[in-house]
Curated annotation (Swiss-Prot):
GO BP terms in the entry: pyridoxine biosynthetic process
InterPro entries linked to this entry: Pyridox_Oxase, Pyridox_Oxase_CS, Pyridox_Oxase_N, Pyridoxamine_oxidase_dimer_C, Split_barrel_FMN-bd
Residues the entry annotates as binding substrate: R8, I9, N10, Y11, K66, Y123, R127, S131, R190, L191, H192
Sorted UniProt keywords: Flavoprotein, FMN, Oxidoreductase, Pyridoxine biosynthesis
EC nos: 1.4.3.5
Gene that produces this protein: pdxH
Binding-site residues for FMN, renumbered to this chain: 61-66, 76-77, 82-83, 105, 140-141, 184, 194
Family label: Belongs to the pyridoxamine 5'-phosphate oxidase family.
Organism: Burkholderia cenocepacia (strain HI2424)
Top enzyme class: oxidoreductase
Cofactor: FMN
Job description of the protein: Catalyzes the oxidation of either pyridoxine 5'-phosphate (PNP) or pyridoxamine 5'-phosphate (PMP) into pyridoxal 5'-phosphate (PLP).
Descriptive protein name: Pyridoxine/pyridoxamine 5'-phosphate oxidase
Amino acid sequence: MTTLADLRINYSRASLDEADAAPDPFAQFDRWFKEALAAKLPEPNTMTLATVGADGRPSARIVLIKGVDERGFVFFTNYESRKGHDLAVHPQAALLFYWIELERQVRIEGRIEKTSAEESDRYFASRPLGSRIGAWASEQSAVIDSRATLEAREKAVSERYGDNPPRPPHWGGYRLVPDSIEFWQGRPSRLHDRLLYTRDAAAASGWTISRLSP
């Protein structure tokens, strides 16, 4: 087995101070996301989505963020997938963005709601044709007997709908409405900077900021 104990990096690129932090986490996230884009990181919109099933078993996977505003963080998927079933019984989730090149993480927790049909339709129409066909062809997370079966379904959907497949009823968007967002900046000697935004109706910005021990 490969020895792992000595694999480590001493983080030193930047700091995160309360005086420099935006008053609300959406503005802070926008700032960091723009910096990730400017740094030309590969797919900075990738995030880990963690859910819990009816049996209490957690699961996590990488998904793509497709929208962020003051209402929350939006992603799209198959409602009949494992994550879809998890969210149907436990509409709470956690997101994690990890931008290792900038030595940064963003951890987000909150409740899940479906986006409107109009939002889902609008995003679905913007997807490449192959992705729209794939949304029909794939029974996401279901067992299939072979790759050939999947490709046969893809061909059948393409022949049925041509260049204009509608959005499947089992496919659409979710919005995570956060109640806490943590920004993590790596620092030397593992004494990292961690600022936690928590919803607070009494605060002027609607959020309070706390520094967490690393």
